[in-house]
Amino acid sequence: ISFIFLASCSVEEQIQQEPDILDDIYFTEFMPCKAGPDFNAENMTAMISEWQKLITAEELLGVWGYAPAADTNSVKDTGWWELQWSSQDAANTAWDQWMQNDRANAWQEKYASVLQCDGEARNPFDAVIPIVPTAYGETNDSGYFYSEVHICEFNEGYSKDDAIEFL
């Protein structure tokens, strides 16, 4: 008895193309905030929980809160609320809607003794993030992280486009 055994193998090489992170430019606003007399973890948790229920803008891509790590930092006791939007137009529209929202105004009044943020003093800029979020490992369970900011200005004759090209 003769057997013929045929085997065929196929190696299909798949190359997963990662998106170019430099293609994403976010409109980001930093809003200064001051802790009030009723500022504590419990009140902040309640405040944020209620705030999340008020947010309807899908263009709001991310929000982070920053508290000073030391009283020697450049902004003293000012905390920051970072809002990351899909565009400046989306941010402006959402802010207009927020200002006209009776529930949002009631929320602000309710938590005025916990945290006071100055929406008029928002510091806007375009953000390009040249690293993937997991570049330094997985995010810890607490959600806390350290960040540091260095303010720079473009040299004469250079622009944002030159900086992005450099990245």
Can you say where each PLM-predicted feature lies in the sequence?
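Short S/T/G/P-rich N-terminal loop/turn motif that feeds into the first structured element of a domain
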Residues: C9-W80, Q84-L167
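Bacterial N-terminal signal peptides
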Residues: I1-A7
